[in-house]
Structure formats: C-alpha cells, structure tokens
C-alpha cells in the first residue's frame, strides 16, 4: 500500500512540474513594420481607418522622440539596437570614417561594408544567437553581413519589389515548418513622395490613403494566415517631414571656398571636413554666414543630441533651422520636403502603434523615445538585450498586465552615454516562475529518492528468499 502511495505521489509531483512548464506560452511572435517618413500627424490629415483600427484594438503613442540626426539609416538602426547614432556608428546616410579612410553612401555599394555596421549588434542577430529565427523584408541593414551573420531569411534590397510581395514573404516565413519569431518589414513611402511634394501639399492626401490601404492589406493577410491574434504587430517609422521652399536656401558657396573643405553629408545637417590647416578659417566663415544656420565644433554639439562621441561625426556640424535647406549652390537638387533637423521638433517625430496579445487595447500613451523600442522588443522576444540607451520602464505600460513570460528578460547593466540606468523592476515577473520551477524540481527529486529507496527496501526480503531457494540442492526423485 505504501509503495502504491509513493508511486502516486511521485507521478503527481512530476505532473505538477510539467504543468509549471506547460503553463508557459509558445514563443511570442513580433512583426516590426516601418513606413519610412510617416509623420505622427499624418494619421489625422485624411481618413486612415486601418491605422485607427489598430489604435482602437491596440496601443498608440502620441509623441515619439527619435534620434539626431533625423535621417533614415541612423534611425532605422536605432530602432533595432536601442542606441543613439554616436553609439551604433551609423551617424548619417552619408558618412566618412577617418580611421579606415572609407566612405558610406546610400547611392553606393559601400553600404554593404560590414565594418560600418559592427559598432552595434542588431536585434535579429541577438535573436538568432538565442536560438530563434528572423526574417527581414528590405529593412535597412538586413542584407548586410553583420558580425558574420545575415538574418535567417532576408530579401536583398530592391525598391521595385511591391509591398504585397514583401508581405507574402513575411507571411511565408511566419507560417513555415520552422517559423520565424521576429519579422521586419520596410516600405519606402510616404518618405519618397514627402520629399517631392512636401508634407503640406494636398497631393500627400492620396499618398497617406494608399499607405493606409497597404496596412489594411497586411492586416487582411495576417488574419487569413491565422496570425492576427497570435502575433504582436508594431507599426512605426524613422522620422517625420517638414515643408521647405526655394525662398529658404543657404548656399555654402556664398561663404566658403570649395577647395577648403569636403562636404560629407548635406542638408539639413551639413557634415563638414575642413582641409588640413583650414579648420579655423572654415569654422569662422560659417559661424557668421547665415542667421538660420547654427554651426558647432564637434566637441560643442549639444549633449541632448548625443552626437559627438564617434569618429565618423565630422569636425564641423552646421544645422539649418526647420524648413531651411543647405546646398553648395543652386545647381544642387532641391526638395520640397525634408528631414534630418533637430529631433525636438514635432515635424520630425514618427508614429508608433501596436496590436497583439502582449499589448493593451484602446490605450494611448503621451510619449516615448525611439531607443525604448529595442528593450520592448527584447522583452517580447524573451531575449537578453545588448547594452542600449533605451528604457523598458518607459514603455512597459503599453503591455497587457497578463502578458506571460517564457524566459527572463534581462536588461544589460552596462551603461552607455545617455543610458537610463536599469532598475530592479525591469526584472519583475521573472522570479516567481523560476522559484516555482526550482521548488517543483526539488519536490520531484525528493519523491524520486524516497520512492527508489522504498522500492529497494521492499524488494530485499524477496531477493533473500530467492537467493535461499537457488542455494538449495536439487531433490533427487
């Protein structure tokens, strides 16, 4: 009877432990989508029913402060690293690295030079190092080998590939036999049209409506694939856009000799590399050049921009006021819409919306930083974050309080310039699970030892009788 009781107890303890594990959910799935240049208030310029559908059944952040400079590549890399540009190294769309004597430009193949990207580790690599798989459809940097890795699946950048084809690939990767848990999707508009038309143009209305239809298509495909209720969808952007005009031009040729400097990056933040021996002359000429141009020595750049501690940031930074355009002369291209300005300006701010099992419903939040997205992603994916400048605490109120955990999310304790110090509550929620598992394991081990011990003791008399019986001589007939 005692033996049966111990056996039943052992089974119950084992079941209790297995239940502890089985109560943990499947791996969270995340799809991060960027509509390039989608300014925060585009949501209200024309009817955007699909964006508002996500706002109603998900979360919305009204003000997202991105990083300086407010350009495409620096901010897309910030979204997936949680770092300021000075820390992740992609400081502009066009750069020069004086240490390696190498250039980086969107228009050239040197964007595939891994060394430019390896001052940071993007989230798809961290996700894969944790044993998971990632898929990227045109997200900037995902077709570059970084730290000897690509995403598990990726589409080499080709702007002619339709939004629908990009969505099809993402759906395919999420529903394959070995599904991804992290997807990244990028679309070039409304940025392209915002540059050509200007954000205040009435012609931007149809462009925004088209983006809303594309979002509607994505939602439809996720529902068709039965992913809508299981996947966490995050919709964001890299920057906004502001209106420019031909009356607000700053021509560098009026103030500087072309032979005295190299213009590394252009409007509205001009990165200027003076020729040897010409620094003071160039700096003084620019300082008094134009009332709508503010000029900084690299070491004097305002701390709030976090834009001085990197060798790829040039010795002189000239920043135009909002709506003003810097060019060498009027023969250069002029854009009716532009971005790159001070990240404190509202017109530079992008959108942020999210929907999924991890997020609250019909919840609106006033503000966050774009650096905060990275620790949020790590939390959702249950992976340990690399050192970053964001704060999970700033965005944890976006989450459903019942959101389950699979493994503990750990925010790095390594602080970078401008970082928010990790707090004890960043770890909150992971301890009960491990305490439960530990106690369950101890109970099972104790019951197992007692059961085996009892089993051995109960079998000793039978073994002695068997031994005695074998030892008896065979009776002769």
Curated annotation (Swiss-Prot):
Binding-site residues for Zn(2+) 2, renumbered to this chain: 191, 195, 339
Cofactor note: Binds 2 Zn(2+) ions per subunit.
Modification after translation (UniProt): N-glycosylated.
InterPro entries: Alkaline_phosphatase_core_sf (IPR017850), Phosphodiest/P_Trfase (IPR002591)
Required co-factors: Zn(2+)
Pfam families linked: Phosphodiest
Bilayer topology term: Single-pass membrane protein
Binding-site list for Zn(2+) 1: 36, 72, 238-239
Signal peptide location: 1-24
The EC number(s) this enzyme carries: 3.1.-.-
Sites where a glycan is attached: 101, 158, 292, 329, 362, 369, 382, 389
Principal EC category: hydrolase
Active site: 72 (nucleophile)
Keyword flag ATP-binding: no
Principal subcellular localisation of the protein: secreted
Annotated keywords: Glycoprotein, Hydrolase, Membrane, Metal-binding, Secreted, Signal, Transmembrane, Transmembrane helix, Zinc
Alphabetical list of CDD domains matching this protein: Enpp (cd16018)
Family: Belongs to the nucleotide pyrophosphatase/phosphodiesterase family.
Stated role: Can hydrolyze NAD but cannot hydrolyze nucleotide di- and triphosphates. Lacks lysopholipase D activity. May play a role in neuronal cell communication.
Name of the protein in question: Ectonucleotide pyrophosphatase/phosphodiesterase family member 5
Gene: ENPP5
